[in-house]
């Protein structure tokens, strides 16, 4: 059950996209900008370009297309062009990419601006390693492509008021953080102690970097960590963490699935949060972790590169590694552990982390600036 993954997805989203534009005429509203997101809404700028740009009620609207994850492009056989999408054959070249219909590619072609969910990701998707085949479509559209980092809801994720964590705390009164750690260990069945607690809340899939985690997991335990994992996904990773829980019953806790309240307790109760992603368009977990004074250990990719400053810098908020390599990740984990035992430096780091601002305010300013530029309102 859900919004995606049905045999008739193309028809569903074609209908929705056409309905959006028809609805504007019915309610007699002409926006200056339409900002469509991902392949599910990619037909909105396409339909506008083909059918509505000369409509007396809708002419002059500018279209922004936002890519959240370029892996999901809306690819279908060419046979749906006319019957399902309702697009005349002479527009086939607009819709076609590598002998298929590609809805995301078509939106990239016709949109006035293309945005992504982080500045680094907007550059990475020009590289075949990240683009899932769309680098050719994007290479000559760089002039209209940019990236704005997403934000988080700082009211929902607020350690000072969050009712789902065992104790509240602030940047100036951190005592509740330790209570959260103690209660987390109690809830997941691990013994109390001063050892650093490493948290992970994630889908257990290859592109989240879990092959790196598998490679050096024993080494992480040997560094003295307790590890708390919440997630589900590929069977190989679920099985691995079940085995690690059995192998290290006093060091490893694994909950298969997703429990929102437990996720919050991990964000609040862990000392470090590991995100070794192979690719990460934006990522929100690292921002949430910072909010709760939990130090991110991340691979420097996509939004992780834009949001976490390595502690080699005096303004550092976490630990980063560049190469997609298990031992580079392990070294970052070791650096975090070494800092953890230097309580003066660790407290300074936690303070910097909790003061980092990843609200929507900055992102909103950037989008408003883009919209004003397109609307001619400098």
For the regions a language model picked out, list residue spans one by one.
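Catalytic cores of nucleotide-sugar-dependent glycosyltransferases that transfer UDP/GDP/TDP-activated
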Residues: 1-378
